[in-house]
Amino acid sequence: MKSRVRMIVVLVCVFVVLPVVGGLVYLSRISAEAAARYYAEAIAQGRFEDAIAVEGTDADADSGVGRGGAVDLRRGRVSEPSSVVSVRVYDARDVRGRQGASIDLSVNGRTITREIYLERVGVPRPHVGMWRVVSGAAQVEMVRAYGYASDVSVGGVSLGALGASGDGGATFPVAASTDGLWHAGSGGAVVYAYPGIYDVSVAKVSEHTQVAVDSVSGASTLSVLSGSREHQIDVTQDESTRAWHEEQLGSVASSCVLGDVPEGAVCSNMSVAGAERVDVEAPTRDSGDLLEVLVAAYRNDEGIDAFTAHSRVCFDEEGEAHIVVIRP
């Protein structure tokens, strides 16, 4: 009986204890360079959950990153994988005893360098052993957006809508009702992201709009690289709608002044009592989608009302364009 018990104990040691101990010994011997390389490979391949698992819960708390209320794109996905060019571990620890390393990633043909810091932990973990990343490769980026969209997402993570429907969404003072019309508006967010190329997805409110990312018309990706940390996503009227707006604004403004609102248009504070004739100069455009026109209304008492009218395009629920013109 004793021999059987002894044999069971031996078997347990051979098949259970020794592999566990051996595994712990192996993990404890993983170098900082190997841990940093695993972390870099996880980011390059878009395995962000694996990269996050290597980071401490307080990662970057002391590095000045200050994520705050930033949208966490580390929970998103890249449109295409990158590759690790090199991993270099510094010879000396910093004053806090942390091990520094520099990782180079090849992203869309460009080499991106990130400096990370690791520190030893008490319990070994898979792939990285006794190391964890306390200052990671993600950084804060500003993504600004403007236009017409019910949702804009980057890397599968929503940044919210651009504009809104109805009078509450108007970006200039409209006294008349715009119920059911979608106004352009601003949006975007501060994001916290690893280096990579991220898909930009836009839920358009109209097919008469076009998308530009970082001033590239028709682009559908956003690059988090080493350069500018500011990005711009625009969902604006397409060229044919812009041209239509400019061509039609003169006649729409004239009709509004005379009190004869064209079908589909919205006139706000435009009517001039006693107006018999209206002159409207060619419109001028600001840097965005706002058109301005100089209007002169000749009244039947020989008086003249001269003012500048403002106009924007809104879209209805079917995505059709409507001209909104106001007298501020």
Predicted feature residues:
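Intrinsically disordered, low-complexity segments enriched in small/polar residues
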Residues: 11, 113, 237-241
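Membrane-lipid interaction segments
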Residues: 246-328
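Hydrophobic membrane-insertion alpha-helices, especially the h-region
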Residues: 4-25
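Short beta-strand edge/turn micro-motifs at domain boundaries
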Residues: 104-188, 193-199, 203, 209, ...
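Core segments of small alpha/beta cavity-forming domains
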Residues: 25-74, 237-269
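Structured interaction patches on ligand/partner-binding surfaces of diverse proteins
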Residues: 203-239, 310, 314
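Short solvent-exposed beta->alpha transition segments
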Residues: 48-110, 262-285
